Amino acid sequence: MKNAIFKLFKVTFPFALAFMMCLPFSMTLNAASVKNIPVKKILSADITGDGKADKILITTSMDKDCFIKKLKVKVNNKVAFTKNCTNNNIHSFTARYAKMSNKNELLQLMGIGDNDYIVFNQIYKYNNKSKKLYSVSKLDYTACEIVSAKKNLLTLRHGDQPAETGWLNWKMNYKFRNNKLVLTSTTTSTVKSIIGNYHNDSYSKLFRKNIFVTEKKLRFYNGSKLAFTVPKGKQVTLKKLTLSKNTMYLQFQYGKKTGW
């Protein structure tokens, strides 16, 4: 996949998402295992792994410019996590609770800054010995959120905004292994164009079907081998997304042929 023509797809993944707007994600959740956690309101849910409901409370303090200067998470009235947010320009925090099993309960914290930029995003697990939350993810500034949780699987919806395609989102599955969330596969066929959801012109109708029109002649590859060439003004269909060494590639179909 070295010579993919969509050069802007070949960006370092965390960097590409560091300066992007927060995705207009759907609020549809797996109701049985994923919950939104309101700030400054107690959520009763098991986070310690004993099967009993714990008290989870998230609070924030503001500076004179209405930015959050400190985030605090309490579990059963004891401080389990603090974050100094001074100079991070965070306006608000969103939080989600996810239960995979009685031993794997997770808490996602996302800090939102100016223009809905994602400033902070991590997933945490509770340590019963230290009574503290510790990170099990490497999300950093990426735009993603937990959407469902099962016994052995956590699903996150991710997003990016390549210049050639506009907003895309997709889902990735993770397993909890050695106290870390690990991708089960680096390739997904769930990738979708979402920019067509906000307009009603002829191109938007195509985007809603994952169809794009080439602005110039493009070459598509399978590995280092040229798969096919598409003339200007032709339609190609987005089929898959894959991640390799912090690089994102997109697979398109032209007729019966596919290439990256």
Task: State what each model feature region is.
Residues 68-73:
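Beta-propeller domains
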Residues 19-35:
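Sec-dependent signal peptide cleavage junction
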Residues 54-58, 108:
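Structural core positions within WD40/WD-like beta-propeller blades
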Residues 2-15:
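Bacterial N-terminal signal peptides that target proteins for export
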Residues 194-249, 253-259:
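Beta-loop motif signature
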Residues 92-123, 130-207:
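Short aromatic loop motif centered on NTY/YTY
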